């Protein structure tokens, strides 16, 4: 990877999947609570596109209120997983700034914002939604898996003006016991007040719990192929 990664802490040890050809687009994908970027780098390598670079950073280890203050990889503190749970506003905003720094690093290395997709699973998906909607750079889109929109009461006012053109693929398991699918549906409803409604796809998967599935990964691949064609 060219460019100085020292000024972007999340890049120094991020798991990456390089493109087989010249990289003209990037997918930045954020893992869920307690995980690392490696598992999603492995999953994304199964649907890789030859001209796309996949970057899967690791969250810092912090005490998590929801898990009895145990220290684990977490993008921000979590107090609960319901639409009315208190939220770590300062932590969410700080995490979003760190992801924006990563986006800007890729832009400096020659990948334009409209060739960058931000995505994530669970807490990582939540952070990807918040970051992309408040980002000053017009990204191509968002892949939001099994997640929610943090600080949802701040939207649509908190969104950047260019956010209305974002394409969003939101996917959710219908049997998710951690982040219920109803929460996902409420999130999709909210997102349609922030971006052009037709740009939001909300797909649900019968029998799937708080995880991904082959059909979902196929939908992600199709979404990325349309948004990030070869140039």
Curated annotation (Swiss-Prot):
Q: In which tissues is it expressed?
A: Ubiquitous; detected at low levels.
Catalytic residues (UniProt)? 122, 176, 210
> A Pfam family name for this chain?
Abhydrolase_2
The residues forming a coiled coil are none
GO CC terms for this protein? Answer: cytoplasm; cytosol; Golgi stack; nucleoplasm
* Enzyme Commission number, as recorded: 3.1.2.-, 3.1.2.22
Which keywords belong to this entry? Answer: Cytoplasm, Fatty acid metabolism, Hydrolase, Lipid metabolism, Lipoprotein, Palmitate, Phosphoprotein
Which GO biological process annotations does it have?
acylglycerol catabolic process; fatty acid metabolic process; prostaglandin catabolic process; protein depalmitoylation
Q: Which residues carry this modification: Phosphoserine?
A: 82
Enumerate the subcellular locations listed in this protein's record, separating them with semicolons: Cytoplasm
- Top enzyme class, one word, equals hydrolase
Q: Which residues form the signal peptide?
A: none
The answer to whether keyword Phosphoprotein applies is yes
Q: Does the keyword Kinase apply?
A: no
For this UniProt entry, the molecular function terms from Gene Ontology, in alphabetical order, are: lysophospholipase activity; palmitoyl-(protein) hydrolase activity
Positions with an attached lipid (S-palmitoyl cysteine) read 2
Superkingdom in the source lineage: Eukaryota
What is the reaction catalyzed? S-hexadecanoyl-L-cysteinyl-[protein] + H2O = L-cysteinyl-[protein] + hexadecanoate + H(+); prostaglandin E2 1-glyceryl ester + H2O = prostaglandin E2 + glycerol + H(+); 1-hexadecanoyl-sn-glycero-3-phosphocholine + H2O = sn-glycerol 3-phosphocholine + hexadecanoate + H(+); 1-octadecanoyl-sn-glycero-3-phosphocholine + H2O = octadecanoate + sn-glycerol 3-phosphocholine + H(+)
What does it do?
A: Acts as an acyl-protein thioesterase hydrolyzing fatty acids from S-acylated cysteine residues in proteins such as trimeric G alpha proteins, GSDMD, GAP43, ZDHHC6 or HRAS. Deacylates GAP43. Mediates depalmitoylation of ZDHHC6. Has lysophospholipase activity. Hydrolyzes prostaglandin glycerol esters (PG-Gs). Hydrolyzes PG-Gs in the following order prostaglandin D2-glycerol ester (PGD2-G) > prostaglandin E2 glycerol ester (PGE2-G) > prostaglandin F2-alpha-glycerol ester (PGF2-alpha-G). Hydrolyzes 1-arachidonoylglycerol but not 2-arachidonoylglycerol or arachidonoylethanolamide.
Q: Which family does it belong to?
A: Belongs to the AB hydrolase superfamily. AB hydrolase 2 family.
The protein's name = Acyl-protein thioesterase 2
This chain's source organism reads Mus musculus (Mouse)
């Amino acid at each position: 990877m060219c460019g100085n990664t020292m000024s972007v802490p999340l890049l120094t040890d991020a798991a990456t999947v390089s493109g087989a050809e010249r990289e003209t687009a990037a997918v930045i994908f954020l893992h869920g609570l307690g995980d690392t970027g490696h598992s999603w780098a492995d999953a994304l390598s199964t649907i890789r596109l030859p001209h796309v670079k996949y970057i899967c950073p690791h969250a810092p280890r912090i005490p998590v209120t929801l898990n009895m203050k145990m220290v684990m990889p977490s993008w921000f503190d979590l107090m609960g997983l319901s639409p009315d749970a208190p939220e770590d506003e300062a932590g969410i905003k700080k995490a979003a700034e760190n992801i924006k720094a990563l986006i800007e690093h890729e832009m400096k290395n020659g990948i334009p914002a409209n060739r960058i997709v931000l995505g994530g699973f669970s807490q990582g998906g939540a952070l990807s939604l918040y970051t992309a909607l408040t980002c000053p750079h017009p990204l191509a889109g968002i892949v939001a898996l099994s997640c929610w929109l943090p600080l949802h009461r701040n939207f649509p006012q908190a969104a950047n003006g260019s956010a209305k053109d974002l394409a969003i693929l939101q996917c959710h398991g219908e049997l998710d016991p951690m982040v219920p699918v109803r929460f996902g549906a409420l999130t999709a409803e909210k997102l349609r007040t922030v971006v052009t409604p037709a740009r939001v796809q909300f797909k649900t998967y019968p029998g799937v719990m708080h995880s991904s599935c082959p059909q979902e990964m196929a939908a992600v691949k199709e979404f990325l192929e349309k948004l990030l064609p070869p140039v």
